[in-house]
């Protein structure tokens, strides 16, 4: 569907199907925002964080998450006055209506989505809300759920491409191929649906994470910088000091990353950033975002 074009004419929409009112700016979106900006692509973000009208699946009692919250007399995070004052206000518009408008107005060539188990259904639900006439884009799913449940994810009609594992190098390669009209079905890390077939490629070795750009969170709302912690609200930014983990906690995906990378690349996934790089990153983030934590 893609004809050769200039980078600025390639339009990427990043969909962030975040847990409701969990103010957090992920490393992945910040890194890709920096990569896409450096490459000259046109990009935008749809952040689900501040919407109130999520459509939760019913639990065994037949209650939605919001109904359960009322039943248990617990208070949602957006009732924190201090957070509201600092810009973390919930949106009163419809999440589906706003997403459809974003797609119709921005007209993306590619929609990029990172999902875990708890955000997969929201992402698919939003894509399903887009009228057929406006679905002139391809979708690319990544993240933990897409990596470990790729056979399930790729069968969904709203999914065209899956990036397993680390995404920076493979996704940039895929974008370059889409722009140039090149062959994409042999791109490492990718599971791709096309011509009635599914093409599954092996992982490539992990990159030197000291070369990853410093995250760019400019597309996020100012309130996303603030997080409640121990009864107070702080201006914060996240920092990636290492990627993966050498330990084998059973509740975490990191041991699995080491296993699949060892099997497919003969190297483990875990890597650390250098002290020099970390100092550069700290200095930049402190100057730009002035975090308290």
Question: Which stretches of residues belong to each language-model region?
Answer:
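N-terminal [4Fe-4S]-dependent radical SAM core
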Residues: 2-8, 12, 187, 193-241
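Nucleotide-activated donor-dependent transferases that construct or modify glycoconjugates
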Residues: 10-21
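Glycine- and acidic-residue-enriched helix-capping/strand-helix junction motifs
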Residues: 20-29
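Glycine-rich beta-alpha loop elements in corrinoid/cobalamin-binding modules
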Residues: 28, 32-35, 42-54, 85-205
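Conserved C-terminal portion of the radical SAM core fold
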Residues: 38, 52, 110, 140, ...
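Glycine-rich, highly charged phosphate/nucleotide-binding loops
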Residues: 57-103
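Short glycine/proline-rich turn/loop motifs
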Residues: 78-81, 105-107, 257-266
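Radical SAM [4Fe-4S] cluster-binding motif and immediate context
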Residues: 210-293
């Amino acid at each position: 569907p893609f004809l050769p074009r200039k980078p600025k004419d390639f339009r990427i929409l990043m969909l962030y199907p975040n847990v409701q009112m969990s103010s957090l700016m992920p490393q992945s979106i910040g890194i890709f925002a920096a990569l896409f900006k450096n490459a000259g692509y046109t990009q935008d973000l749809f952040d689900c964080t501040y919407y109130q009208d999520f459509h939760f699946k019913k639990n065994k009692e037949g209650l939605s998450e919001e109904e359960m919250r009322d039943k248990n007399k617990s208070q949602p995070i957006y009732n924190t006055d201090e957070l509201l004052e600092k810009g973390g206000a919930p949106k009163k518009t419809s999440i589906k209506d706003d997403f459809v408008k974003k797609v119709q107005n921005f007209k993306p060539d590619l929609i990029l989505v990172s999902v875990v188990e708890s955000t997969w259904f929201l992402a698919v639900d939003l894509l399903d809300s887009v009228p057929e006439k406006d679905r002139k884009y391809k979708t690319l799913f990544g993240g933990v759920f897409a990596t470990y449940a790729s056979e399930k994810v790729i069968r969904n009609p709203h999914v065209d491409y899956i990036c397993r594992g680390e995404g920076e190098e493979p996704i940039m390669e895929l974008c370059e191929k889409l722009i140039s009209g090149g062959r994409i079905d042999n791109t490492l890390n990718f599971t791709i649906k096309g011509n009635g077939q599914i093409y599954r490629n092996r992982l490539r070795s992990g990159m030197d994470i000291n070369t990853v750009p410093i995250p760019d969170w400019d597309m996020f709302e100012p309130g996303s910088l603030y997080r409640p912690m121990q009864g107070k609200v702080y201006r914060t930014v996240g920092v990636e000091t290492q990627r993966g983990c050498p330990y084998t906690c059973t509740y975490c995906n990191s041991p699995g990353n080491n296993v699949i990378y060892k099997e497919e690349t003969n190297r483990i996934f875990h890597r650390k950033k250098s002290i020099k790089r970390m100092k550069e990153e700290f200095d930049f983030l402190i100057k730009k975002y002035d975090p308290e934590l």
